[in-house]
A protein has these predicted regions:
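Charged DNA-binding/catalytic regions of mobile-element recombinases
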Residues: 1-226
Length: 226
């Protein structure tokens, strides 16, 4: 249990219990919680951050099935020499699946389109693509791509990242579980570790909003019933 907590340091007992159940471990939630606390295991606090001063608004488009709404956004980090790189993420807002990512020092509209093309080959095109107003996303070339795939572009209001809350949540999760604990040698090292983390996240990370299923488990369950 201590080893598990060490490798999942942002998981509380509920998420850990859900994961244990999925692996066939039979134990009641109250018993698991008692053991978790007896071992002195707690969710490690995040670093302090400035609180939001604006209200949390409801998204303008709500996904009600897989493939309806994808969200795309950038995240930044640096290697051990302090050289900054960008990570572009695409997630499915309904299943929370991490569908695609790309790691580069610089990234323009052409790179975004190439990543989206690969995601479409694997999953089909989304009905809606949610993004902020960054130059890579509002570029005419991305608009043409969306038109060719019958995809509506949904841009969030400037300066209001909480409208892209699903992908922001992914950013926080990856920073907590991967970026803060690793020093990347170069881009290939970052790509390898992020790729491995993405696989674990999709297959193993329980979400309370998904009934404590992982994104892949939830997608499979939905497909079985629809």
């Amino acid at each position: 249990m201590n080893d598990f907590a060490a490798t999942h340091r942002r998981w509380g007992y509920k998420r850990a219990w859900a994961r244990a159940k999925s692996e066939g471990i039979v134990i009641g939630r109250d018993t698991f919680r008692r053991l978790w606390r007896t071992e002195g295991l707690r969710v490690r606090p995040r670093k302090a951050h400035k609180p939001r001063t604006q209200p949390r608004l409801q998204p303008l488009v709500t996904a009600r099935a897989p493939g309806q709404v994808w969200a795309i956004d950038f995240q930044f980090d640096s290697d051990w020499k302090g050289r900054v790189f960008k990570v572009c993420h695409v997630i499915d807002e309904f299943t929370r699946q991490h569908l695609a990512f790309r790691v580069e020092r610089r990234m323009g509209a052409a790179d975004v389109i190439e990543m989206l093309d690969l995601a479409v080959l694997a999953h089909g095109a989304p009905q809606v693509l949610r993004a902020d107003n960054g130059p890579e996303f509002i570029a005419a070339a991305v608009g043409r791509w969306a038109s060719e795939h019958d995809t509506l572009q949904a841009f969030i209001p400037p300066g209001q990242p909480w409208h892209n809350g699903f992908v922001e949540s992914l950013h926080n999760r990856m920073r907590d579980e991967l970026l803060e604990d690793n020093m990347f040698e170069d881009l290939n090292h970052a790509r390898a570790l992020i790729g491995a983390w993405s696989q674990r996240y999709n297959e193993e990370h329980p979400h309370s909003a998904l009934g404590w299923l992982s994104p892949n488990q939830y997608a499979r369950q939905w497909a079985q019933h629809h």
